[in-house]
Amino acid sequence: MSASEEMLGGARGESTTATGPFSFSSEPTLEDIRRLHAEFAAERDWEQFHQPRNLLLALVGEVGELAELFQWKPDEEPGPQAWSPRERAALQEELSDILIYLVALAARCRVDLPQAVLCKMDTNRRRYPVHLSRGSACKYTDLPHGATSENQAMGPADPASESTGQVST
């Protein structure tokens, strides 16, 4: 069975609508993807076209192609898990294109994506404390109990303000 057949539900068309939690395969890593794409581009002498602006525009174009797959689908539809094999293959291709361009853009901009994700998740944990955000779609600036800015949602930045109870601005 090829990797693409496995990702689409197997060579015999097994269902991909498992009800349990989903997890990604451990390989390839983001570094593997960066290297594979860099080799692919180098073999074709395409690095000259891979300036950040061009990579970003290609990424946005691929996001548009992904959006087209969802466009005009009814909201009550079960979702991509119930799509035809052809639609699922298109979904897989567009998501792959997006990841490839995202990794290439990050590499070109010298952003270590795994580390950036860890930092961003830490920021999000501070912005969206569980007790204020559980079940809410509110932006952190709109959370209840006076959390009206990132600094307030994350807590006081000035240690002196902790003793007075005032948040510095």
From Swiss-Prot:
Disulfide bonds: none annotated. Keywords: Cytoplasm, Hydrolase, Magnesium, Metal-binding, Nucleotide-binding, Phosphoprotein. Mg(2+) binds at E62, E65, E94, D97. Substrate binds at H37, W46, E47, Q48, F49, H50, W72, Y101. Its cofactor is Mg(2+). It is an enzyme of class 3 (hydrolase). Residues 1-26, 143-169 are annotated as: Disordered. Probably binds two or three Mg(2+) ions per subunit. The modification Phosphoserine is found at S84. Pfam families: MazG-like (PF12643). PANTHER family: DCTP PYROPHOSPHATASE 1. Hydrolyzes deoxynucleoside triphosphates (dNTPs) to the corresponding nucleoside monophosphates. Has a strong preference for dCTP and its analogs including 5-iodo-dCTP and 5-methyl-dCTP for which it may even have a higher efficiency. May protect DNA or RNA against the incorporation of these genotoxic nucleotide analogs through their catabolism. Homotetramer. This is dCTP pyrophosphatase 1. It comes from Bos taurus (Bovine). The lineage of its organism: Eukaryota, Metazoa, Chordata, Craniata, Vertebrata. The gene is DCTPP1.
